[in-house]
Amino acid sequence: MIEETLLEAGEKMDKAVEVAKDDFASIRTGRANPALYNKVIVEYYGTPTPLQQLASFGVPDARTILITPYDKTALRDIEKALSDSEVGANPSNDGNVIRVTIPELTKERRKEYVKIVKGKGEDAKVSIRSIRRKAKDSLDKLVKDGEAGEDEGARAEKELDALTKQHVDSIDELLKRKEAELLEV
């Protein structure tokens, strides 16, 4: 039972790190990155559809993203969705593909994004600590109910602490990398 609790906590912590990684990827750095458009929804034949299901992405240079729709009739809808998105880029449509030029970030905007990234990183750490707290409560209950010995409970708690530290450290590493990427001119 202890092993299942630790395994479940580890899986949930892995998921929290993945969510943080996705959140960080969706924050613009001034460099072309197709992940910026993961959350763009296109109104396609009346149905809200994620952009990555309608087009392929290419990055010909550091400031340009090339979006090639699988269905050319979706060009206008994709262009409208890109214009309306919060990414802050101006798409240009040449009839076959959409080119999105990523504007240079100002110093103030970079600092603003760093604050956002730190907030998302802190949210991820809080989530990991919450998972740890719930797992610890489960472990304590197992020991209290006599399903596990106190020594086993103490060993499992040490494992849980190591697991928590490992995941918090990986969030810190992701945070440090994203911050460096944002502040790089």
UniProtKB/Swiss-Prot annotation:
Location(s), subcellular: Cytoplasm
Residue ranges, annotated region (Disordered): 142-161
Molecular function per GO: ribosomal large subunit binding
Cellular component aspect of the GO annotation: cytoplasm
Keyword check for Kinase: no
InterPro entries: Ribosome_recyc_fac, Ribosome_recyc_fac_dom, RRF_sf
Top-rank lineage group of the source organism: Bacteria
One GO-annotated biological process of the protein: translational termination
Keywords: Cytoplasm, Protein biosynthesis
Stated family: Belongs to the RRF family.
HAMAP family the UniProt entry points to: RRF
Described purpose of this protein according to its UniProt entry: Responsible for the release of ribosomes from messenger RNA at the termination of protein biosynthesis. May increase the efficiency of translation by recycling ribosomes from one round of translation to another.
Protein name: Ribosome-recycling factor
UniProt organism field: Paenarthrobacter aurescens (strain TC1)
